[in-house]
Amino acid sequence: MSYELKICLEPVGFVKTDAVGHEVRDKKVISQIVFREELTEALEGIEEFSHLFILFWLNEISDQGRKTMKVHPRGRSDMPLLGIFATRTPHRPNPIGLTRVKLLNVEGNIITVQGLDAFDGTPVLDMKPFDRWDTAEDFKVPEWWLKLDTERTNKKE
């Protein structure tokens, strides 16, 4: 098996948002995805779903960031040093983002969503509807993840 395979992707659209910096992490942020005109008919029926998965290219990650192999989750030194595949860091060999968003509106080749943690101009690679099969009933996470989740929940309250 050769690991030299090169994959060339063409964005299906681009993110349009006024959010900047850490604001994009706010799950209340409203964004638009402007799809290529010739893909408009591919959106037919998507309005029947409440939530979607958006796959996007993290184009602001540097070449050095793509070489990162270990990180502390959320950049916090009080968290364990882990391999990047055990975290949700954007620094990875193939900087692909994946976010579940709430679909608010579809108009022509533009969809409006809530909760997309991507910057203005981010290339969108694909979109898929979210359904009940995408929820695991018996998942587990490590202790450090539970700590971060508890802190995030307490911060919201």
Task: Label each PLM-derived region with a short phrase.
Residues M1-R100, L104-E157:
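Glycine-rich, low-complexity intrinsically disordered segments
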